[in-house]
Amino acid sequence: MFQTINEISIHPELYNQKKVLIQGWITNIRGNLKIIFVELNDGSSFKNLQCVLKKEFIDFDKIENLALGVAVEISGIFSNTPERQQFGEVLVETLEIKGNNYNTNFPIQNQEISLEVLRQMPHFRHRSRLFRVIMKLRSALFFEIHKFFRRQGFINFSAPILTSNDGEGAGEVFIVDDENKDFFNKKTTLGVTGQLHAEAYALGFKKVYTFAPTFRAERSNTRRHAAEFWMIEPEVAFFTLEQIIELAVKLLQKVIKSVIIRNKDEFIFLEKAGDKNLRKRLLQFCDSQVTQISYEKAIELLLEHQEKFEEKDLFFGCDLKTEHERFLTEEIFHMPVVIINYPKNLKAFYMHQNEDGQTVAAFDLLVPGIGELIGGSQREVRYEKLLARMNELNMNIEEFQWYLDLRKYGNPGSSGFGLGFERLLMYITGIENIRDVIPFPRTNKNILM
């Protein structure tokens, strides 16, 4: 029976002086004519297992093709080594090569290779140590989010990826069709959000959420934007703006703390590689009240520091740039912050219109290092108000009649938000580019594979 490196590293004392059988890939190799040290990784952990090959046990002539990247199966006696940095090593008794390199060197010759270089080989970069850590945390975060919603009584809802509606109204969509251009007999796009369909299902299940890929044809070439990314979108019937903000904060604090607790070694590695205060900063947020201010107040605060920004044209109704959002979180509040009641011209058509006639019941949750992490709102439930807003924006009413019809039959109102999964992973890991937290990034002018 095969063991995993993760199993052995968690409780090395249980395997001390016992025979183990491991399959994995060589990440480092060094030695001489009498002894060879091989570091092995099997994907179960970012940690490597040191394997010692001695000439008296292994025929070195039969393993002359050993090299970085080669897949092997080894058996031998494991020794726990608590006095060293590593958790233990295996004295190899048998070694069988299961997958050789084909007349070439493995592309990742240095485990400290930069993220910029790794982006050019997305099919191999998960075999580097840093990217392995990032992807393991991505998987852990994925499951913690599903666990949170399950415990909160939510139903997971699968929104369609193909849709005839632009839920954000920005027009930044990918158009889908077949060669004859008549497959659906109407304009069809990849979904920019699952929210509109989630609203329909919230009227019956009350608490629903989607967790799926989202597609936006944004030509923004920034470290925060991608054409394909994952979104978490809960929708709750009967909820007000304040209640959905409370849910958003609770979600972040719960899943971040859980991921930190369950992945201690990965965070130690990240802190050594970059932000030494990573866990301290994250846990401080998890244990704190989140400040909430109005958009109007945010503009007032930013105007006090106007000279520090590239975009100095700040006024009620302007769209906050990333530099403004980060300044609020990093220089003024030194923590994540929630901004509410945005001007309606900045937000989507479906948001509840406030009594002042100028703002909508919307919120953005901003975090240091990134800016906007979550955007949400209370939905407009009043049929005439919603219809008037759609006409004001010259929307195709016929295409959205089904959405208007939701207001006709027992609609108590609902609220929801969208959380960018990759941006959350960036915040948790301290990784600065969205291209480095997704397996195969798709961005403007870039689609490898």
Curated annotation (Swiss-Prot):
It is found in: Cytoplasm. GO terms for molecular function: asparagine-tRNA ligase activity; ATP binding; nucleic acid binding. Its EC number is 6.1.1.22. GO terms for biological process: asparaginyl-tRNA aminoacylation. Pfam families: tRNA-synt_2 (PF00152), tRNA_anti-codon (PF01336). Belongs to the class-II aminoacyl-tRNA synthetase family. This is Asparagine--tRNA ligase. The lineage of its organism: Bacteria, Bacillati, Mycoplasmatota, Mycoplasmoidales, Metamycoplasmataceae.
